Curated annotation (Swiss-Prot):
Gene Ontology biological-process annotations: translation
Gene Ontology MF annotations: rRNA binding; structural constituent of ribosome
Cytoplasm in keyword set: no
Name of the gene this protein is made from: rpsQ
Superkingdom of origin organism: Bacteria
Biological role stated in the UniProt entry: One of the primary rRNA binding proteins, it binds specifically to the 5'-end of 16S ribosomal RNA.
Family matches, as Pfam families: Ribosomal_S17 (PF00366)
Record protein name field: Small ribosomal subunit protein uS17
GO cellular component terms, semicolon-separated: cytosolic small ribosomal subunit
Description of how the protein assembles with itself and partners: Part of the 30S ribosomal subunit.
Gene3D superfamilies, per database record: Nucleic acid-binding proteins
Keywords attached to this entry: Ribonucleoprotein, Ribosomal protein, RNA-binding, rRNA-binding
Amino acid sequence: MSERNQRKVYTGRVVSDKMDKTITVLVETYKTHSLYGKRVKYSKKYKAHDEQNQAKLGDIVKIMETRPLSATKRFRLVEIVEEAVVI
């Protein structure tokens, strides 16, 4: 059970929910440049498993690393932190 706590947990924004039971999450983070020391923003997209299709486009979600669920899915949806405002 203690190994579950070592899994990666990321917070990001849903950029695609068009697939069945799958969302694409954009995670933005910062890296420090090795020579100049400036913080540089970079982003990465992860596909995550959404069993109930509850996450919608623009939501802020938390995803956790899990066993491989498909060729590209390695994460699952933990919770929806903030729902998107629909205008």
